[in-house]
Every structure is written in structure tokens, then in C-alpha cells.
């Protein structure tokens, strides 16, 4: 009988089962109407445009893989050209599953040209226990571009009473405005991360965090947002510097975080949130 070489079976099988997805979207202004430019889709990522082209265009990002697993690689690029307007959300919360392999890689690039506006409003990212994910968010804005961005991360399936005990989450944000770096931050949680959650400087006992970023933003906007904060169930800090405003949340559960985030975004946007947020 001929011998079979199985030395690479495990690694080859793991690599073959990993999902890869890419989406690149360009939108352009044409006579006051925002229209789709080139759209590129590959692998398990898709983008859909549920509303007709009008003053602002809405888009929905869909992950047909049903979630994110170790070793997956996803790339999203949005290019909002001069005076165009785009709002993008996701079809559902993104789940990052447990893995004993390498971390999933998520690469997000957001570019907004002069007079353009982007609302990047994905639903929650839920990290299962022993999930491993590394995310990069790179933002490039013209001096007079505007941005409304939200990100929410849930550590464990809180609705099922599960808290993330071990895993890895690296979140790297960089924002440039007019070619100048105006915001840079990297969050790094690795290993026994549950032991960090109780620390006041980390999560202070919470299991859900959120960030809302508003450009441009000033002291007047901060005061308007703080007027709503007295009713929040989550801890929140709101401030402005370098021409933008930011609200940071830490909550005991995902539902509380989502409700408070919706209030902040509604005030910042001055218009209704995507319908998928309300379902």
C-alpha cells in the first residue's frame, strides 16, 4: 500500500477554510445627486444599495460567511468624492468566533474628499470567548469633509450570560485631516483579558464599549450631546479637540450601549438612523 503524507493536512485544511472578503466602493456627486462609482466585491463580502440614488446614498455591508473566524481576512475601502454623501451600515451584528489559530484581520479604509460626508454606522461587533481579532481603521478627510462614525464592541455574548475570558483584540485607529494626523490610538487586549475588565482605566466592570466620532466637532456640539447623557445607563465621556468631537461609552450590557449610542448618533446626525438599527 502506498503511504500518504499527511504532514501538512492540518495547516492546509485550516487555510482552505478561512474566509477572505473585499469591498471597495466609490461614490460621486452629480448635479446634487450622489451616485455609485466603481464597486468591487470579492470573496464573502457584499455591498447592497437599498435606496435609490438621491442627495445621499445608503449602503448595507453583508458578510455571507456568517461571521468572522480565526485567520479570516476582510478589507473594506470607501471613497467618498467631493460633495458626495454616503451612509453605510451592516446587515447585522458581526460575530467573531473562538479560535485556536491566528487572529482574524480586519482592514478598514475611509476617505472623504472636499465637501463630502460619510456616516460609517456598522452594528455591534461581538467577540466570543477565545476570539482573536486585529482591526485597523484608517481615515483620511479633506479639511472641509464631514464624518459621523460609530463602533461598538461587545466582549462575550452578554444576552446569554457569557463574558469573554480569554482572547485577543487589537484595535488600531488613525485619522488624518487635511493631510495631518489628528488622532491616533491603539487598544491592545491579549490573553487573560477578563482580569482587566474590572480595572477603572479599562472597562470598570463593563462588558461593552462604544465610540462615536464626529467631524467637525466643537464645544457647542459637546454641550448638546452632554444634555442627553444624564439619562444614559452607560458610563460616557464626551469631549472635543483638534476640530472633532468624540463620545466614549462603557456599559454593563449590549442593549444599554446600543440605546445610548442611538441617542448620541441621532443628536449628532440630526436625522434618522438607518432602518436596520431600528429592527
Curated annotation (Swiss-Prot):
<protein>
    <recommendedName>
        <fullName>Urease accessory protein UreD</fullName>
    </recommendedName>
</protein>
<comment type="subunit">
    <text>UreD, UreF and UreG form a complex that acts as a GTP-hydrolysis-dependent molecular chaperone, activating the urease apoprotein by helping to assemble the nickel containing metallocenter of UreC. The UreE protein probably delivers the nickel.</text>
</comment>
<keyword id="KW-0996">Nickel insertion</keyword>
<dbReference type="Pfam" id="PF01774">
    <property type="entry name" value="UreD"/>
</dbReference>
<keyword id="KW-0143">Chaperone</keyword>
<dbReference type="GO" id="GO:0005737">
    <property type="term" value="C:cytoplasm"/>
</dbReference>
<comment type="similarity">
    <text>Belongs to the UreD family.</text>
</comment>
<dbReference type="InterPro" id="IPR002669">
    <property type="entry name" value="UreD"/>
</dbReference>
<keyword id="KW-0963">Cytoplasm</keyword>
<dbReference type="GO" id="GO:0016151">
    <property type="term" value="F:nickel cation binding"/>
</dbReference>
<comment type="function">
    <text>Required for maturation of urease via the functional incorporation of the urease nickel metallocenter.</text>
</comment>
